[in-house]
């Protein structure tokens, strides 16, 4: 997400959907589709498809959202550093959909 004009387009890193049961959803998606589990715990999982990641999240822990790579947030005091050292913050679009701005650049 950049306000500067560039020839490259922004990248959607993942889409997060709310599920009732992480393990049950992992089983469904990995048997129904060709994807790989790259992380899972009790509150979320990440499945890697060929072109995008799908996050399965528990509603009480994570909102459904679209994550867009935005390396400009690395120095934003409102951003949060995660255990994998990625940095993110949530914003709302005009229709109150959650967007996660995400950077893999290390602080």
Description of each model-found segment:
Residues 25-30, 96:
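Conserved active-site tyrosine of GNAT-family acetyltransferases
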Residues 33-38, 78-82:
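Short linear motifs in intrinsically disordered
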Residues 35-69, 98-105:
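Conserved short beta-strand elements that form part of the metal-binding/catalytic scaffold
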Residues 18, 36, 85:
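Charged, low-complexity surface patches
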Residues 1-26, 53, 64-66:
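N-terminal beta-strand motif that seeds the catalytic metal site of vicinal oxygen chelate
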């Amino acid at each position: 997400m950049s306000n500067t004009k560039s020839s490259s387009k922004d990248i959607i890193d993942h889409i997060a959907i709310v599920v009732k049961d992480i393990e049950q959803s992992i089983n469904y998606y990995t048997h129904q589709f060709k994807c790989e589990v790259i992380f899972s715990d009790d509150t979320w999982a990440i499945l890697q498809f060929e072109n995008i990641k799908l996050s399965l999240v528990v509603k009480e822990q994570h909102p459904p959202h679209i994550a867009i790579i935005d390396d400009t947030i690395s120095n934003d005091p409102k951003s949060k550093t995660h255990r994998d050292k990625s940095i993110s913050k949530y914003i709302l679009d005009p229709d109150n959909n959650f967007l996660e701005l995400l950077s893999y650049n290390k602080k």
